[in-house]
Amino acid sequence: MVEADRPGKLFIGGLNLETDEKALEAEFGKYGRIVEVLLMKDRETNKSRGFAFVTFESPADAKAAARDMNGKSLDGKAIKVAQATKPAFESSRRGPPPPRSRGRPRFLRGTRGGGGGPRRSPSRGGPDDDGGYTADFDLRPSRAPMPMKRGPPPRRVGPPPKRAAPSGPARSSGGGMRGRALAVRGRDGYSGPPRREPLPPRRDPYLGPRDEGYSSRDGYSSRDYREPRGFAPSPGEYTHRDYGHSSVRDDCPLRGYSDRDGYGGRDRDYGDHLSRGSHREPFESYGELRGAAPGRGTPPSYGGGGRYEEYRGYSPDAYSGGRDSYSSSYGRSDRYSRGRHRVGRPDRGLSLSMERGCPPQRDSYSRSGCRVPRGGGRLGGRLERGGGRSRY
């Protein structure tokens, strides 16, 4: 670590305290031109400390002088002559400062960046300047990490809202299958919009799905919705075909349908969804089943006299954009139409209009499961007749 001082500078040690600069210059001037003679003196007493530095203009002269003069006696004392080296205190003064200067910026950078500095400085109660920095930077880092900590929870919370948003409709539907129906819809990609879209497409969607194999009685239910069977049934699957979404309402009697068809719960949930959206108008148009004359105007036709029956295998899904819960319900609706509450005398004349139209209002048959609807007896029978005459 000992560094040579500038070339041509010699260290002369072991001098007599009486020897001065002039004596040194006279002694070493024989080897070459001397640039500087520096006799080290005590600051307080101003007396020689016994060593000096002589700088030659030419490094070669310095080397010759060191070679010749080393160990010779000057003023009665043997002197030591060698290439001058940087003093230890000087090198230490210069050396350590760079690390210190480097270290301090590092410390400040740490405090600025991650707040590591602030943690250290309080523990040791560092200098004021460091403390000031830590005070300044402490706020920033302390704030920064907290947002980082807070950040992830929002992310975690975010997805649940997404899940919950779909659940909103399911919950409002009030079906026993809320979660399951929701999952079912999510799985098939049926969301809110399909509920409203169905009205126009109702005419042909039946053919498409029917051809695709959805018309099978259990096509939808058995295929996608087996899980829901265990749920509290809503008025069974006879809903769409014969009673026209009687399952659409939750108030529809749940009793006696689950045993006949495990799909009640499913229908109930989907019935609600559909009734709320695309099928409300059709149901209302048939609301007369409850008490008004059915002449309120036949609801939109779905493709002709028997088409509705043909597609009774379709759940309102067919109407509501392909929702899947009613296929089985329609497939089995015949049983209900024939076996359950036969109200009134089947009358073929009206069955056609009923077939053409959307199912009755949700209210009319939501209660029809329990009692014959007011003013709807004959109409119900006709509906049943229409169902009986269907291809199924």
Curated annotation (Swiss-Prot):
It is found in: Nucleus. Residues 319-331 have a biased composition (Low complexity). PROSITE patterns: RRM (PS50102). GO terms for cellular component: nucleus; ribonucleoprotein complex. Expressed predominantly in spermatocytes and less in round spermatids (at protein level). Expressed in germ cells. SUPFAM superfamilies: RNA-binding domain, RBD (SSF54928). Residues 67-78, 194-229, 238-283, 381-392 have a biased composition (Basic and acidic residues). Pfam families: RBM1CTR, RRM_1. Signal peptide: none annotated. Residues 150-163 have a biased composition (Pro residues). Residues 8-86 form the RRM domain. The keyword Lyase does not apply. Residues 67-392 are annotated as: Disordered. One of its GO terms (molecular function) is mRNA binding. GO terms for biological process: mRNA splicing, via spliceosome. Keywords: Nucleus, Ribonucleoprotein, RNA-binding. InterPro entries: Nucleotide-bd_a/b_plait_sf (IPR012677), RBD_domain_sf (IPR035979), RBM (IPR050441), RBM1CTR (IPR012604), RRM_dom (IPR000504), RRM_dom_euk (IPR003954). The keyword Coiled coil does not apply. This is RNA-binding motif protein, X-linked-like-2. It comes from Homo sapiens. The lineage of its organism: Eukaryota, Metazoa, Chordata, Craniata, Vertebrata.
